[in-house]
Amino acid sequence: MSTKNAKPKKEAQRRPSRKAKVKATLGEFDLRDYRNVEVLKRFLSETGKILPRRRTGLSGKEQRILAKTIKRARILGLLPFTEKLVRK
């Protein structure tokens, strides 16, 4: 029972599982497309804020993707950061 010549055991390596990509589409529109301003404006309030999930009906992951897309469009100047305050 000598351990000098014993080969070390190889541990079984597990292949990392792939995360399923979220289908971030709204009908035929892709929510990741920051150039489609007409679709993105549907998810903004009158003052330019991003609407919450309970109003948009998107899942959590889809809402995060949408928020990132809207912010990207704002930085590129395709969407305004704010709208004028509407007083009634």
From Swiss-Prot:
GO terms for cellular component: ribonucleoprotein complex; ribosome. InterPro entries: Ribosomal_bS18, Ribosomal_bS18_CS, Ribosomal_bS18_sf. GO terms for molecular function: small ribosomal subunit rRNA binding; structural constituent of ribosome. GO terms for biological process: translation. It comes from the Bacteria. Residues 1-22 are annotated as: Disordered. The keyword Ribonucleoprotein applies. PROSITE patterns: RIBOSOMAL_S18. Keywords: Ribonucleoprotein, Ribosomal protein, RNA-binding, rRNA-binding. PANTHER family: 30S RIBOSOMAL PROTEIN S18, SMALL RIBOSOMAL SUBUNIT PROTEIN BS18M. Belongs to the bacterial ribosomal protein bS18 family. Part of the 30S ribosomal subunit. Forms a tight heterodimer with protein bS6. Binds as a heterodimer with protein bS6 to the central domain of the 16S rRNA, where it helps stabilize the platform of the 30S subunit. This is Small ribosomal subunit protein bS18. The gene is rpsR.
